Amino acid sequence: TCALPIFPINPHDEGAAISGSIALKGARIDDVVLNRYQEEIEPNSPRIVMFSPLETALPYYADFGWVVDQGIEIELPDGETIWSADRDKLIPSQPVKLSWQNGQGLRFEREIAVDENYMFTITDRVINDGTRSLLLYPYGLISRTDEPDTLGFFILHEGPLGVFDGTLQELTYDDLRDNPAETVQSTGGWIGITDKYWLAALIPDQNIPMTGRFYYTNTGSREKFQVDYLLEGKPLAPAGRIEVTNRLFAGAKVVTLLDQYESDFG
């Protein structure tokens, strides 16, 4: 079978902080390599793989989109959606705009930008060329299959965490196993999963009320740990458009960099 088109992140740039790719099928952020860090000290040691697609041994990815209230019949983009892209690569000076039409009067656009370090900015738009009024809720999620090897240090948190209304909340993987679905209300803040050196974090629009969630499922053979948020619904009238901008950090926990992002984005 022929692989579906992908566009690379920072191709041919040995000095870039990250590399990887985004597949037009699903348009998830699911292939991110940290170029400046290696698994071992040896010169030829593999670079750190931050995110991996579903078909790999240890899937770990971020996804964004829209949902509607139960009972509303409308086709929304999902992991099977084949998007069109206006460019063939993603670099800091050049965002990629994706588009898809659902055949029911809605046009979906997603603009993905990346900075010089580890921050993605995802702007999702919906344009209503149809005759129906709708209420769409933006969401973002980070999904990780199976618990990684952790150091188990008492003083070092590894696992799900978030900041909600200014308060830090940390959960262990065992906490999620014991309580598979926990929700938190907040305006602003962020939610993510941390390792000793690496952090994946969703930073939604800081001015919109959100419901953050820590979520766990077990199929018997694989465990899935998920953090996600659902934002307040956005009404979409005929001939109207709605837009939401969210951010994703996927990289090394460099304190000066994290402090700068906190200053920039709240």
Locations of regions flagged by a protein language model:
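Soluble non-transmembrane domains of integral membrane proteins
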Residues: 1-266
